[in-house]
Structures are given as structure tokens and as C-alpha cells.
Amino acid sequence: MSSLMTAVYGGGPFYTGGQPVIDDLKNSGFTTVVAWAVHVNSSGDLIYNDPTIVSNGQYVGDSSWPGLLANLKQGGSVNRLLFSIGGWGTGDFENIQALIQSQGTGPDSILYKNFQALKNAIPSIDGIDLDDESLYDQDTTVQFCQMLYGLGYQVTFCPYTMMSFWVNSLYALNSQTPGLVTGFNLQCYAGGAGNDPKDWIDAIQKKMGPDFDAAGFVFPGLWCRNGDGCTQGDCPDSITSQFKAWKPDGIQGGFIWLYDDIQKCENSGTCSGSMGTAAYASAIVQGLQG
């Protein structure tokens, strides 16, 4: 088994795909699965893409989902499950900010109650991934993350820009509570296509000090084959080449965006060789270990 962290983000199929999707992930070689995206509406409800899954302190999602997600981490390659909040064009973090300003983050607040209900219903969730692409408010981020940590969640950040915001938020959180934030899942595609993990590693190192393992904290991600005709994005072999180029930076893993597109394009024939889930997990490992 590799000690590298290999993650895959995915959306609807994780909720609607049933046991076949769970089995595909378990047999893939990916060590982390990130369910994307949880949205927080103005009343604090938690919505997984379209269906509401938590409301008024109660889990109201598909009753079979907690069992499927528990099974995900049993007997396969997956050892960590994250739920990601946000994305492009959502008001999730603005809603979180407004809810914190009106109710705080204590046990009586709806944010606390709903994230506690999520953890109680699906205890196999290890952490919450923050994909803030609009608000970038450090006070909101710090208060929200401290609440999540108190409920038993790890926290990861999923940045594509605004480096100083993310690095300063990391410092504010981890200088008070070492280990609260466990990594940056750095988008190196779409809006983040110009990102070089080394720049982020250097910025984290400078802020956090010489004893902090900045190289082991940044996990770059690439977008698999996608788009009309599956002609956009990366094939597994180009992902291997990119991770090989990043290997000297000392990174210890990476991620693939997006499982939905792996499913869509797996049989498109637009890459030489396999385009299945396992091929993409292997591509990261081959790049970093080859």
C-alpha cells in the first residue's frame, strides 16, 4: 500500500449510484473520497447538490446513504471521507457568515445543530473541505472551522486563488490548535490552472515557520477527461507526467476532479489505455513514486 494521499472528488453519483459506485471507489486505489458539494442555505439547511440532507437539526437525506458511506471505508483502499462545502457561484459562505453573525456557533445555533446532526447520522465523515470561491472572510472561516473541529471534524482547504487568505486562515487556526487544518487540496485546473504547488508550499512554509511540513501539506489536483466528447482535461498518462514534474517539490499526494466525469468518459476512447477510476488513482502514484 502506498502512503501517498490520493483523493477523488465526486458529486451526484456518490449519492445516487448505490453499491456499484461504492465498490468502484473501494477497488480504485484512491485513499480519500470527497463528496462535493454540500450547500448551506440561508436557514442553515445542508443540501447535497439538490436533495436536502439535514434540516432543523435532523438528518433527512436518503436513509441508505449513511450505511453506504460506512461501507466505503471497509475492506478497500479508502480510509478517509470528506464532505466539501461551496464551489463556484454558490452563496454558501455568505450564508454561513450571516448565520454566525446572527446566531454564533454555540450548541444552540443552527449551524452547530445541523453539522452535529450530519456527524451523528454519518459518523464515517472524517472532515469538512472548504471550497470558498467568493467570500474569503477570515473571521467567518476561523469561527466556522473551530466549530467543526469541536464537533469532531478535520478541516481541509480547497483553494484555487487568494493565497494570502488561505495561508493566513491556516495560521490563525493552527497556531491556536495545531492539526485543525490538515491540508490544502490545491486546484490546478480551470480557474487554478496557473497554480504551481511550489508557490503555495513556499508561502505556507514562510508563514508557519521552519518546523512545519509545508511540502506534505499541499495536494495538487487535476481534472480528468471531461467536456463534450470527452476531449478536454487530462488523460491518466498526462497526469502521471505532471505529478512526476511536481515530485521534486516534496508533495505527498494529490487529487482528481471529478468522479462524475470519470464515469461519463470512461468508455469514450479518448485516451490510450484505461480511463477508469483505478487508472486515475494509479496515475498519481506512478508520477510520485516512479
Predicted regions and their residues:
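Chitinase-like catalytic core of GlcNAc-active glycosidases
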Residues: S2-T240, P248-I251, D260-Q289
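Conserved, well-structured core segments
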Residues: W257
